[in-house]
Amino acid sequence: VHLNIVNGLLDGSAIYNGDFADPFALHVGATVYVYASDTTTAHIPVLAADPTTDFAGQYLGDAMPTLPSWTFPGYQWGPAVWARPDGTYVLYYATPDQAPSSACIADAQRAHVTAGLCYLAWSKESRQCLSRAVASSPTGPFVDDSTGPFICPRRQGGAIDPSVFVSADGTPYLVWKSDGNGYGLPTAIYSERLTSDGLAVAGPPHRLIGATQPWEGNLVEGPSMVEAGGAYWLFYSANDWDTPNYAIGVARCRTVDGPCQKPLDHPLLSTTNDPANDQGPGGQEFLDVGGFVWMVHHGWLPGQAGTPNGQRRLYVDLVAFDGPHGQPALAAGSLAAALADVIDGATVPGQPTNPPDAYLDEVHASASPYAKQSDRALLALGHSTCTSLGGSQTAAEGEKLVDGALRKGADPLGRAVPVAFAVQQLCPQYLPGLRQDLQSMLYH
């Protein structure tokens, strides 16, 4: 399967202007709910995003306003939510497996500090572990009635970053990270089958991958799994979370429980050389909207990685699984390179700047453009469309040409990608029409 990630299909900007790290997206009805790690105002912040308006996010509040008594606020990380068949929802999250003593908390409050000797001792003794909560609505309130975490490998440093995967037969699994890096221990990604209600484990954990490549540094984390093309694709984040070196990788697994192999020796999505782009992308999760796969992830604002007041913003990318190759690749990278050639006045290699109608018809008619045509050929299609737009007398006429280019043929995604890139880069005055047409095609 050839994996294409179209980074910033419409405008590449964040969909929520606030700190929103380790996102998880859940599609319910006409709304996409996105959850994140704790902030100063919420244990599990949640927002509602509308996929028909570029996933513009509206903050809703705290999905779990009350924590169980055995844990401690300020460390609720990497949430994931499963929509159960009975219409209820299960929230999985990482949280400390114990709280500091009441005396320690009182001392810290009197001294107006959040750390001290007792906190240092508590941080060494406690572990981040996984718990679960239930709600009747995706917005909560989620209630955790447990007496302790249900996944907690203390000897491995604990567990964080739960992600739900449901197999074709409806069996729920949780993939998660052993959190050893804070204790001088190795990290790894595991999968574990859950009971039918999702509230307990139903089998032993299976190790999927560890940190084995130079770009990963000393850790792998933030797992998420997608089934496509007869394989299970395990996406993960790696390297130091608070640096621009943080990036997203991928492994191909034979089953949910492995074995898994990494087909690349480099990240799938990483910090670019453009100082205007977000840095250190990670925390990726996936959702299906209208038959199209989208990836949500966070990224540091430029220059803010690891700074005291730095923010990780929320981004969404379009993903395509198609093609004859067994090795994933980024479509955005090759398209961007080809666009640079076009912008500089060069022709697209192997294709004329304005492909003839016969060639365009061949591309349009392809049932699977990603499998049958190269990225540069698709770009040529988009460039031709944009060139045609340049000769339009009015914006309305240009928008009609965009509409025609998108709707001709059987694969809207295969056309939307190059047309979107070309219009965005070469004739942005037609972006409003393009945006409207894409929304109409992808979501209605």
Which role fits each region the language model picked out?
Residues F55, A200, P369, T394-A395:
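A general structural signal for well-ordered secondary-structure junctions
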Residues V1-A30, A346-T394, L442-H444:
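Extracytoplasmic low-complexity, Pro/Thr/Ser/Ala/Gly-rich segments
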Residues N17, A36-D38, P73, S123-K124, ...:
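Extracytoplasmic/periplasmic, Sec-exported soluble proteins
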Residues H27-A30, I189, D288, A358, ...:
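Extracytoplasmic/secreted proteins, especially bacterial periplasmic and envelope-associated proteins
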Residues A36, L67, P85, Y93, ...:
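Sec/Tat-exported extracytoplasmic proteins
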Residues P267-T272, Q279-P281, V363-A367, G382-S384, ...:
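Short, local alpha-helical segments
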Residues H383-H444:
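Extracytosolic low-complexity repeat regions of secreted or lipid-anchored proteins
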Residues V1-V348:
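Carbohydrate-active catalytic/glycan-binding domains of CAZyme proteins
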